[in-house]
UniProtKB/Swiss-Prot annotation:
Substrate binds at residues 129, 307. Its cofactor is pyridoxal 5'-phosphate. The keyword Iron-sulfur does not apply. Belongs to the alanine racemase family. The active site is at residues 34, 259. The modification N6-(pyridoxal phosphate)lysine is found at residue 34. Keywords: Isomerase, Pyridoxal phosphate. It comes from the Bacteria. SMART domains: Ala_racemase_C. This is Alanine racemase. The keyword Isomerase applies. One of its GO terms (biological process) is D-alanine biosynthetic process. It catalyses: L-alanine = D-alanine.
Amino acid sequence: MNRATATINVTALKHNLSQIKALAPKSLAWAMIKSNGYGHGLVRVAKALSDANAFGVACIDEALTLREVGIKSPIIVMKGFYNEAELSQFARHRLGAVIHCSDQVSLLKKTNLTSSLSVWLKIDTGMNRLGFSVEQSPAVYNQLKTSSSIQKPIGLMTHLADADNENKTFTELQIKRFFSVTEKMIGPKSIVNSAGFFAYPNALVDWIRPGIILYGISPFGINYNSFKEKIEKKFRPVMTLSAKIIAIKNRRKNDSVGYGCTWSCPEDMPIAIVSIGYGDGYPRHAPSGTPVLLNGKICPLIGRVSMDMIAIDLRSQPNAQVGDDVILWGEGLPVEIIAEKAGTIAYELLCKITQRVQFIEIEK
């Protein structure tokens, strides 16, 4: 019997990109496919999103993987390069680089490149992670402008730290800082991630950087409902994680279920054992009561998540059988709900799917 399965709907992926483009017709789409395509498969996602204007990845290894399979679209590496060998590969494979520190500027000055490089200057407007400060950025921009190793115009970008917060004060400050510092700079601009895409239409500039929304998942989780209807109406979940019932047991009242005896049967009742666990990427900290979907109805998780199995309450599903499919998240059960129950975010759940899960592509 197959173990857990992640079904990837490539039609939904293409649909989501088309919706993004329709909602921001004046912007180019830089599709974020880092971290193995947010757990959906780097190459699979890139091939499905051939209509994206460019791809964003975290590191050079991801970019080279795409080039090796024949992806010819522009690719921008968010962390840039860190030595001369990497910089040479950027030029050889036509990779765009985000420039976020003085060491990278120095490398550009001293390295002889076979061809000029497309770069984006990262301006730190408040994320306080990577990038040049607002005060440093004009001088760095002027340095880059004089480099013969760099294609012109230079891209200008920032990253929003709090765009998914209903309190807009800090994000509006970041956007104001970015527009102010780049006012006299010439070059394409990029500000918004998925949350910013919905919440800050004034920041939909030359390039947008959709990430989690490409995969049909709200960047706001389940708590921020301002865009809930729009997201549910226009976007479709791409991944459905499912596993099969491998055993059905009738338990007595007060029988405990699973490690630690944390959950006991309130009455005589049937339970099902499902072939998925934290060894597959299902969150160990999902508590009893976390929903799963069985034959179109919600059933609650009971007891602790094991490495290879979970148990679910079958009292609402007396006709369930061994071999039935159980949906852990995806079509009909948003992953945002599971993330909330487990005290995490949907991004983490998607990225933690392990290698023993079988991936299947569908077009639906």
